[in-house]
Amino acid sequence: MSLSIIFMGTPEFSVPTLRLLVDAGHRIVAVYTQPPRPGGRRGLDLQKSPVHQAAELLGLPVFTPVNFKDAGERERFAAFKADVAVVVAYGLLLPEAILNGTRDGCYNGHASLLPRWRGAAPIQRAIMAGDDKTGMMVMKMDKGLDTGAVALSREVEIGPNMTAGELHDRLMQVGAKAMAEAMVKLEMNDLPLTPQRQDGVLYAAKIDKAETRIDFARPARDVHNHIRGLAPFPGAWFELEIGGKPERVKVLGSELAEGQGVAGQLLTDDLVVACASGAVRLTRLQKAGGKPLAASDFLRGTPLAAGTRLS
C-alpha cells in the first residue's frame, strides 16, 4: 500500500524528504514549489528551486504558482484527489481551500520543538538564543502560524560550537525520516495528534540585515551564539580598516576564549577579541568578494596585531 501525496517545498532542506517519500513507494501526484527566480552573475537567468530540480530528475510533475488566490489554482490542487499534502519549507501561505484540499489535510515538517520558535527562522533563532536542543516536528497544519497539532517529534542536541549550517544539515535528515515515519503511521490510521502547549510560545522572526552586525559590547557567549547562529548565511560581520578603508568581514566560526579587555579589541595576534565580559576567538572569516578562510589563512593575507579594534 502507499499514499498519493502532493509534495510542497522549495529549498535544499526539503529535498531529502521528497526523495525518501519516493523511495518509500508513495505516489507523488504533484510537486509544488516556488517559481524560478532571477539568478546568475547578472541576474538574467531564471533558476529553478532545489525541489524543482530534484522533482524533474525524479520524473515528477511540477507546479509553480505565485500564490493560491486564483480559483483555478485551488481547483487544480483539489482535482488531484490526493490522500495528503506534505509541506516542508514551501514558503507560501496556504489558504483553507488548500489546507483542506486533500483527504487527510496538510502535514508540515517544522524545524523546532513547537511551540518554541514558530515562524520563518527557527534554526538560526534557536542557536542565537543559546538553546542546547531543538528538533523536528511533524504537525497537521491549521490556519495559524505553526500552531497545528503535533503528530511526531524528534529531538536534536545543539553542540556548543554548532553553526546554523551544521544544524540545518542535521535537521534536514532527521526531518526527512520523521516525515516518512509519520506517513507510514498515517497510512495505518495510527497517527494520533497532540495539541501544542499554550505556554512557551516564541516566534522566530525572519533574520533582518540590520541585526547581522556583531556587537562586541555584549557578553562573549552572546557574541559567540550570534556568530554561529548566522553562519554561513547571511553571516555575522564586523568592520575592519584595511588600507585606510573600512571593509566588511564576515565571521563564519568562533569559540569562547579566555581574556578581558576593551570590547572589540584584539587581545592576541590570533584573533581573540574582547567582549563586554570574556572573549571569543574568531576561527573562520570571509572578506567581501573572497572565499571563507580559516583564521590562520586569513591572517597570512591580513596580519592583525593585538590592540587592533574591530567595529
Swiss-Prot record:
PANTHER family: METHIONYL-TRNA FORMYLTRANSFERASE, METHIONYL-TRNA FORMYLTRANSFERASE, MITOCHONDRIAL. The keyword Transferase applies. The keyword Calcium does not apply. Belongs to the Fmt family. This is Methionyl-tRNA formyltransferase. The lineage of its organism: Bacteria, Pseudomonadati, Pseudomonadota, Alphaproteobacteria, Hyphomicrobiales. Attaches a formyl group to the free amino group of methionyl-tRNA(fMet). The formyl group appears to play a dual role in the initiator identity of N-formylmethionyl-tRNA by promoting its recognition by IF2 and preventing the misappropriation of this tRNA by the elongation apparatus. Its EC number is 2.1.2.9. It comes from the Bacteria. Keywords: Protein biosynthesis, Transferase. It catalyses: L-methionyl-tRNA(fMet) + (6R)-10-formyltetrahydrofolate = N-formyl-L-methionyl-tRNA(fMet) + (6S)-5,6,7,8-tetrahydrofolate + H(+). SUPFAM superfamilies: FMT C-terminal domain-like, Formyltransferase. Signal peptide: none annotated. (6S)-5,6,7,8-tetrahydrofolate binds at S112, L113, L114, P115. GO terms for cellular component: cytosol. Disulfide bonds: none annotated. GO terms for molecular function: methionyl-tRNA formyltransferase activity. It comes from Rhizobium etli (strain CIAT 652).
